[in-house]
Amino acid sequence: MKALQFGAGNIGRGFIGKTLSESGFSVIFSDVNQNIVDAINYNREYFVKIIGSNQNKTVNIKRVSAINSNDSNIKKIISSVDLITTAVGPTALEKIALIITQGIIFKIKNQFTKPLNIIACENKIKSSSFLKQVVLKNLPIKYHDYLNKYIGFIDCSIDTIIPAINNKDDLFLTVEEFKEWIVNINQFKGAVPKIVDMKFSNNLDAFIERKLFTLNTGHAIAAYLGLIKNYKTIQDAISDKKIRVIVRSAMEESGSVLIKRYNFNKNDHLDYIEKIFLRFENPFLSDKLERIGRNPLQKLRREDRLIKPFLGAFEYNLPYSNLAKGIAAAFYYHNKNDLESIELSSSIKKQGLESTIIKICDLPVNSKEVYSIILEYNLIKKIIR
C-alpha cells in the first residue's frame, strides 16, 4: 500500500505520516520545502519522540520518501497510490487541488481504475468535500463520472498537538501521546484502508466542531491574550489567572453551543475540556504563542474557530462574552513577521475597526455581534491587566 502525503510539516510527519507508516503504508511526502524533501530522501527515515502521561518514547518512522510539490512527476505518483492525505493549511488546498486534478487526468488517460481515497486533514470543516468541489471545478466535465465512481473524498477530524521545537535534526519531532483521527466511513471508494487508531463515524460534523470549538478555540484565545501580555508559550499564558479564566470560560461557552446543537452530555464535554487544558499545561509540549496565533485572517473567518462558536452562541441565545474577548484579542494581535497580521493591522488603521470586523468575519452591519467585539476590544487591556 502506498500513500502520498501533501505537507511534510509537523502534522504531516508527526501525525499523519507516522500513523500511515505504522499502518504498513510506504509514505511519499510532497512539499515545496526542498530542504525537507532532500533530508527525507537522504535519510529514508525520521524519529518522533512521543510525550506520554507516564513515560516518553522515541519511535523510528521508516518506508518514507519525498518529492517536491512542483515536480511534474507527481501526477504519476497520484495515479498509482492507494491513498492521498493533506496537511498543508486550508488556504493551500486550492493549489493542492490543481495538482491532484492533473494526477486524476493522468490516471484516467492511462485507464487506471484502482480506487483512490483522499483525506484532507485540515482545520476546516469538511475540508475533503471542499477539496472535491475545487477538483471538480478544474476537471473536465467528461471526467466527472469517473471521479464519482473511483475517487473518494473523505471528511475527517484530527486532533493532536505537535509544538514547533528547534532540533539539530530537521526531521526530528516531539508529539503528544494523545491523537484522534475520525473519518466519515460512508465516503470511501473500494475497500476501507486499515489505519492504526483511525475511528469511523456517521456523525462527523459533531466531532469536527467539538475539536474546532474546544482545542482550536481555546488554543487561539490563549495565544492572542497571552501575546498582549508578551508571554511566549501556551504554558505561560494559561498560568496567568485572568487569561486562564477567560480561556476556560470561552471553551465552556463554545461547549454550550455543541451541547445544544448535538445533544452532547454536559458532564462528558466538561471532562473533554479538562483534558484539553491538561494538554495545554504539559511542560514537555511547550508551544510558542506566535506559532499558535499566526495567520489571524484565517482564524477570524466566519466558519473558523473563533467566529463560528460565537455565532452559535447568538443562534441559541447563550452566553458569549468570553468568546468576544478572545475575538477582540485576535484583532489586537500584531506581528511584523506575519503577513496576515500586517494586513489586519493595516485594515484597522485605514478602514477602522468596525469595517474590518464586518469584512473579515462576514458579520452584518450594525449588528450586536460586531458591537460586542468592539466593546471588548476597547476594554481588553484593562480586563487582563
Curated annotation (Swiss-Prot):
Superkingdom of the organism of origin: Bacteria
InterPro entries found in the cross-reference section: 6-PGluconate_DH-like_C_sf, 6PGD_dom2, Mannitol_1_phos_5_DH, Mannitol_DH, Mannitol_DH_C, Mannitol_DH_N, NAD(P)-bd_dom_sf
MF (Gene Ontology): mannitol-1-phosphate 5-dehydrogenase activity
Catalytic activities: D-mannitol 1-phosphate + NAD(+) = beta-D-fructose 6-phosphate + NADH + H(+)
Record Pfam families: Mannitol_dh, Mannitol_dh_C
Catalytic activity, EC: 1.1.1.17
Binding site for NAD(+): 3-14
Protein's recorded name: Mannitol-1-phosphate 5-dehydrogenase
Organism listed in the record: Buchnera aphidicola subsp. Acyrthosiphon pisum (strain APS)
Gene: mtlD
